[in-house]
């Protein structure tokens, strides 16, 4: 396997909290898939959850080489967790098309957060 994409993003959690306080769920509805939005609304720390998902999708779009836009939307990238709690990444629509264009077969994701920041790295591999 070869690495065909690498993306990293960092988000200040307080910036997301301020946006949510100012605009309500507008950002969450733009960034999160329907399944992610359900988790967000029930989460004990929704702004922290949103910050991590925002950073994850930005990192994934960078790894795809497009950024958000140019055919790739926040809605085309889903961040979940496996049965052990480790983060997973799934691509649909424009993000999946770009993944296939890169002849990539798998995406790996690491999410970390501390008091003030969330940081994510995404690696995309081909066979």
From Swiss-Prot:
- Principal localisation: cytoplasm
Keywords from the UniProt entry: Cytoplasm, Fatty acid biosynthesis, Fatty acid metabolism, Lipid biosynthesis, Lipid metabolism, Magnesium, Metal-binding, Transferase
GO MF term set? holo-[acyl-carrier-protein] synthase activity; magnesium ion binding
Q: What is its EC number?
A: 2.7.8.7
Q: Which reaction does it catalyse?
A: apo-[ACP] + CoA = holo-[ACP] + adenosine 3',5'-bisphosphate + H(+)
Membrane-spanning ranges: none
For this protein, the record's SUPFAM superfamilies field holds: 4'-phosphopantetheinyl transferase (SSF56214)
Q: Which domain of life is it from?
A: Bacteria
Q: Which InterPro entries did the record assign? A: 4-PPantetheinyl_Trfase_dom, 4-PPantetheinyl_Trfase_dom_sf, ACPS, Ppantetheine-prot_Trfase_dom
The Gene Ontology biological process annotation of the record reads:
fatty acid biosynthetic process
- Binding of Mg(2+), residues: 9, 58
| Cofactor names | Mg(2+)
**Cell compartments where the protein resides:** Cytoplasm
Report any Pfam family annotated for this entry.
ACPS
Q: Which GO terms describe its cellular component?
A: cytoplasm
What is this protein's function?
Answer: Transfers the 4'-phosphopantetheine moiety from coenzyme A to a Ser of acyl-carrier-protein.
Q: Which family does it belong to?
A: Belongs to the P-Pant transferase superfamily. AcpS family.
Protein's name according to its UniProt entry: Holo-[acyl-carrier-protein] synthase
Name of the gene this protein is made from:
acpS
